[in-house]
Regions:
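Acyl-donor binding region in acyl/amide transferases
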Residues: 75-78, 83-84, 89, 96-198, ...
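Active-site/acyl-donor-binding loops of N-acyltransferases
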Residues: 22-33, 96-97, 138, 180-182, ...
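Hydrophobic alpha-helix feature that most strongly marks membrane-spanning transmembrane helices
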Residues: 260, 264-267, 286-289, 303, ...
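A conserved beta-strand-loop-helix scaffold within acyl/acetyltransferase catalytic domains
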Residues: 26-110, 174-330
Length: 414
């Protein structure tokens, strides 16, 4: 059976009862030149080495170094690296968290999950070791671009074996890969599933393509109804003063409180994965600098009511985090006002895409966005429990449990 790299996997690998044996067999049949290590974080890897695997990304080495210095509550960060002959050939950020298995339950099902957690916490909450980061829009699992297809397979096999051995040493039973982008998951899905990982649909990322020459051109691209709604929201917003800044000196606490207020008013609750360190905005803006980070601030009568953190790349603007005061922000339609300012910012920078995260899907689709799929992989290190996980996986996909995504799927299928 061939995987996406054109390499041949052992016959019957999907029927492996012990993924650890699969990894050892795969690794034994390949080159033994790979060395796996677990640095204290991405920041402990040489910047040039990391940038070679992930060139021109705002969520790059400087970003990870900043967030690793002050992780959000409940998380511990490391990295995992594979080298050969002293050269980094594969790497990924690594996180540790006590994960609630009921996290996908949202909307009307959320009280059931909370009841289970209160009643049987040891059944619901488990230590997890995962590739990726709660603070990145996708899992940065990367490979040296000079590797051949078969060498990538070898490097990935070594990385997975190193991850399993680390989990065994630390007594962690659940392994995960958070938010692997669809285009990056396809070539390695066979290897991951052969190693015992199951996959479920994660929360997709909203992306607005920008083949437009102006703000007016963008608005004309919307449907008549959505165009009318957007124009009305902008017209009735009132006297909103907008400012784009690259320094938040003196505003750090206020900006963090805007984010926290928005999180508290959300209809959804993804627990630890939504939390930020109080130092996040200060540290990240300072680390990335004005070439990589900016904030849109919205004030009414001098009072700061909303903020939007943007990351800057050559062809993409990442609308990273949004915060707003309630109810004043809604009264002034600040979601729409700040959205348009973000689109203007992206157009002014010549960006081809405006990426706006994993929230407010229905509204963002009305504003022209599409949804890029993301995948979550997981494996229990006990084979019997892992088989149960594999069977249960389709039932707990995030796109089924998230009420907004479920409604979008229903409308599409209907």
């Amino acid at each position: 059976m061939a995987d996406g790299w054109g390499a041949t996997l052992p016959q019957g690998y999907l029927a492996q009862t012990d993924p650890r044996q699969f990894l050892m067999n795969m690794f034994a049949s390949k080159s033994q030149d790979f060395l796996v290590s677990t640095p204290a974080g991405v920041g402990a890897i040489a910047e040039a080495d990391w940038q070679r695997l992930f060139p021109d990304e705002a969520e790059g080495w400087a970003y990870y170094r900043a967030v690793e210095a002050a992780p959000p509550p409940g998380f511990r960060f490391e990295a995992i690296a594979v080298s050969r002959g002293g050269r980094l050939v594969a790497a990924a950020p690594l996180f540790h968290v006590t994960y609630r298995l009921d996290t996908p339950l949202q909307g009307r099902l959320r009280p059931i999950g909370d009841w289970l957690h209160r009643t049987v916490p040891r059944v619901v909450a488990h230590p997890v070791m995962g590739l990726g980061s709660p603070l990145a829009d996708r899992c940065h699992l990367g490979f040296d671009p000079d590797l051949s297809h078969s060498e990538r397979e070898q490097a990935l096999t070594a990385l997975l074996q190193g991850l399993d051995e680390k989990a065994a040493r630390e007594g962690v039973r659940i392994l995960a890969i958070k938010d692997l982008a669809d285009r990056e998951a396809q070539p390695i899905d066979g290897v991951l599933q052969g190693a015992g990982f199951s996959r479920i649909a994660g929360l997709p990322v909203s992306v607005l393509d920008l083949p437009f020459t102006s703000e007016a051109d963008y608005i004309r691209s919307l449907s008549a109804n959505n165009r009318s709604v957007l124009r009305r929201k902008l017209k009735t917003a009132g006297p909103v003063a907008l400012e784009t800044v690259t320094s938040i000196a003196g505003l750090e606490d206020e900006i963090y409180s805007l984010y926290e207020e928005t999180r508290a008013n959300s209809r959804f609750d993804y627990g630890d994965f939504e939390q930020l360190s109080p130092r996040y905005f200060r540290d990240v803006v300072a680390a990335l600098g004005p070439e990589r980070a900016a904030l849109i601030l919205a004030r009414v009568d001098g009072r700061l009511l909303a903020m939007k953190l943007l990351f800057i790349e050559k062809d993409r603007i990442i609308d990273k985090f949004w915060g707003m005061r309630y109810p004043a922000g809604r009264e002034h339609n600040l979601f729409f006002v700040a959205w348009m300012e973000g689109v203007r910012f992206a157009l002014a920078h010549g960006a081809r895409r405006y990426q706006s995260g994993q929230t407010a899907y229905a509204q963002k689709m009305k504003l022209g966005s599409r949804l890029d799929p993301m995948w979550v992989y997981f494996r229990h290190r006990w084979p019997v429990v892992n088989r149960i996980f594999r069977r249960a996986a389709p039932l707990i996909a995030f796109d089924k449990m998230d009420p907004e995504l479920a409604d979008i799927r229903k409308r599409r299928s209907g």
